[in-house]
A protein has these predicted regions:
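Juxtamembrane transmembrane-helix termini in multi-pass membrane transport proteins
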Residues: 62-107
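Transmembrane helix-bundle signature of multi-pass membrane transporters/permeases
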Residues: 81-89, 115, 215-226, 282
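Hydrophobic transmembrane alpha-helices of secondary-active solute transporters
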Residues: 50, 54, 184-189, 221, ...
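Juxtamembrane transmembrane-helix boundary motif
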Residues: 1-50, 71, 77, 98-185, ...
């Protein structure tokens, strides 16, 4: 009986988390691992919220990490982007394992269409586009993505208020999803997030898809996009510096718990509560960006 309970798929997220903890302790030792979290407490605290958001919504952990690091902690956007992709490779992987093991519904056909183009987009972006993108432009692109996401949530709320039911089953057009996934992948290479937002927006706006099902779908796509982007950063571009490595060691123990928890909790809560929470986060981020852009706009006009 105990063996059957342990080998159930619902236990696999726990095994993944325990495996990550065991590896970190083996590599660093318990006291050093704990000390790393304390020394980078601001990053660990940021990712406590970021991982919860990543696991349970269509916003990756980078949607919290990127603005906090660039606007509050004054960390270079290039560093924040590399960190966002890397940390999502752990947190969103844990969330994806939870989604599949707990059989949280997804649009499987959409995942199969979107994954190859999102992978191509993030690869092209990291290798050829990101090195040429100005710092303020990168921040603005991220805020624009979040604004699109907010409008998508508002549209979804309006439809529900007017008793327009969501679609459990959709018939996606392949070309449309491939183009949107490519654009989302490019955005992910610039700011560490984007494939999930673009895909979620398309599902909700064009197909009136179920929000929770669309959310789980976008999390799966962003997981693989992050893994591909992080692999390029680590082994081809060599952009995982000692500074970023320190941030990761502090954040990984947090996100492998927070992301699965977010995936589980957000599959249970009312959609209205989830939407309100996300709109507050987006409003704060866009307000910070407008504040930063204001001096530049004054110079232009």
């Amino acid at each position: 009986m105990m063996l059957q309970r342990i080998t159930k798929p619902t236990m696999w997220p726990l095994f993944f988390t325990l495996g990550v903890y065991a590896t970190l302790i083996w590599l660093q030792g318990f006291s050093q691992a704990l000390g790393q979290i304390i020394s980078e407490f601001h990053i660990a605290l940021t990712m406590a919220l970021g991982s919860f958001v990543a696991g349970g919504t269509a916003l990756g952990g980078g949607a919290v990490a990127f603005p906090v690091m660039t606007k509050l902690l004054d960390i270079d956007p290039a560093i924040a982007k590399v960190f966002s992709l890397a940390i999502q490779s752990f947190g969103m992987t844990a969330a994806t394992i939870t989604i599949f093991c707990r059989r949280i519904p997804v649009y499987k056909n959409v995942i199969l269409m979107a994954l190859p183009m999102a992978a191509l987009g993030v690869t092209l972006s990291l290798l050829y586009i990101a090195p040429l993108a100005p710092r303020l432009l990168v921040k603005s692109i991220f805020s624009f993505l979040l604004l699109c996401f907010a409008l998508t949530l508002i549209l979804r709320w309006w439809r529900k208020a007017h008793h327009q039911p969501s679609s459990e089953f959709i018939q996606p057009k392949m070309l449309r999803f491939m183009v949107v996934a490519l654009i989302g992948g490019i955005a992910s290479g610039l700011v560490g997030s984007g494939a999930d937002i673009a895909l979620f927006a398309l599902l909700v706006i064009a197909y009136n898809a179920d929000v929770k099902k669309a959310t789980a779908t976008s999390v799966v796509v962003m997981t693989f996009t992050s893994l591909i982007g992080s692999s390029i950063n680590a082994w081809h571009l060599n952009t995982i510096t000692s500074e970023i490595n320190g941030y990761l060691l502090a954040a990984i123990p947090i996100v492998v718990v927070g992301a699965p928890l977010g995936a589980y909790v957000c599959s249970k809560v009312k959609v209205g509560h989830l939407v309100s929470f996300l709109l507050v986060l987006i409003g704060l981020e866009v307000s910070f960006t407008c504040y930063e852009l204001y001096p530049s706009l004054l110079e232009l006009f």
